[in-house]
Amino acid sequence: MKYYIECTVNKKDPLTGRTIETDVDLSLPYLVDVEPSQMNDEWAKARLISEYWADFDPATPAPRMWWETDSEKDENNDHYTLIVYTATDDGEPDFDNMAAGASMDAWEIWKEKKHEH
C-alpha cells in the first residue's frame, strides 16, 4: 500500500525564544510502498530516527537537556514529528487517514542510539 510521509521539526530561536516549525527535506522518498501489516508507530519511529541522522551535521554538539547545562535551558534539542498518511491513487496524502506517527526530541534520538551499541 502507498503511504505519504510528512516530517517536521520544531526549532527554538535562541534570540526570540519562539518555536518555529519547518518541514524536513527527507533523505528518502515522501511516497513509500509498505505492506500494511508493517506500517505502525514503530516503523514511523525508525524512519524518524534515520531521517534525523541523515540530516545531522557532525559539527553540531550533542543535544543536552536543561539539567545538563549551566544555563538551565535545553541545547540543540529540536523536536521532530513524522506522520504517515495513506496516499490517494495519484500519490497525494489523504490527510483524513493517518496510518502511523512518531514524535521525538533530539535528546531522545541520541538516547536510542546509545542503546543500540
What are these regions (language model features)?
Residues 1-2, 111-117:
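Short intrinsically disordered terminal tails
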